């Protein structure tokens, strides 16, 4: 009976409901005959990550795909229309600490005039994509540890409070520019894109 009922079943993901899905657009413009990456500096009034450098993006809503979310967020934050965005390709999905999954998309902006939503963005700027292909970021390692809640039943676990939980490691990258420090998940996405650009475009 199990074979009949589950034989064609496809594997899902445990605790899928706990995964926070987000999407970002990595915007490119043509400037001086080469590709530039457009960045946002988050508004100082925001509750999360004020003043940090990032890409336009946000949470994936229940009724949309990550690609649709990336486009929607870019339109809202950069005050541009859908026809100004040409999605070039999906980039590699990033699994971040805290059960977050970020789907980045590379996109070309047509006729971007440095507009942005003042409620979310302080200002925008661009950096040549080639610069990231020619400069490796600084890398620092962080350690991820398990901290059980106060009511955790240690008496039911071998070793009790001395139980040896597994520890994880997470690399954090930094690009230092005169415009500011590009770090964290933004830098990790950039590093991956820069490697693709260097190997698939510049060195071909």
Region spans (language model):
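N-terminal leader/linker segments that precede catalytic domains of diphosphate-processing enzymes
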Residues: 1-54, 58-104, 108-113, 130, ...
């Amino acid at each position: 009976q199990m074979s009949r009922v589950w034989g064609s079943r496809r594997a899902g993901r445990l605790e899928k409901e706990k995964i926070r899905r987000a999407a970002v657009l990595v915007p490119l413009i043509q400037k001086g005959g080469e590709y530039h990456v457009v960045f946002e500096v988050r508004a100082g009034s925001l509750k999360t990550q004020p003043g940090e450098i990032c890409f336009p993006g946000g949470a994936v809503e229940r009724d949309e795909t990550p690609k649709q979310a990336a486009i929607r967020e870019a339109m809202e934050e950069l005050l541009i229309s859908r026809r100004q965005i040409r999605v070039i390709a999906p980039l590699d999905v990033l699994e971040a600490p805290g059960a977050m999954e970020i789907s980045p998309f590379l996109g070309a902006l047509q006729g971007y005039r440095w507009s942005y939503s003042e409620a979310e963005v302080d200002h925008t700027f661009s950096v040549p994509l080639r610069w990231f292909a020619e400069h490796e970021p600084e890398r620092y390692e962080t350690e991820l540890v398990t901290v059980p809640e106060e009511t955790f039943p240690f008496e039911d676990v071998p070793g009790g409070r001395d139980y040896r939980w597994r520890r994880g490691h997470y690399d954090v990258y930094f690009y230092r520019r005169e415009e500011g420090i590009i770090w964290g998940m933004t830098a990790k996405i950039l590093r991956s894109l820069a490697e693709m650009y260097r190997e698939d475009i510049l060195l071909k």
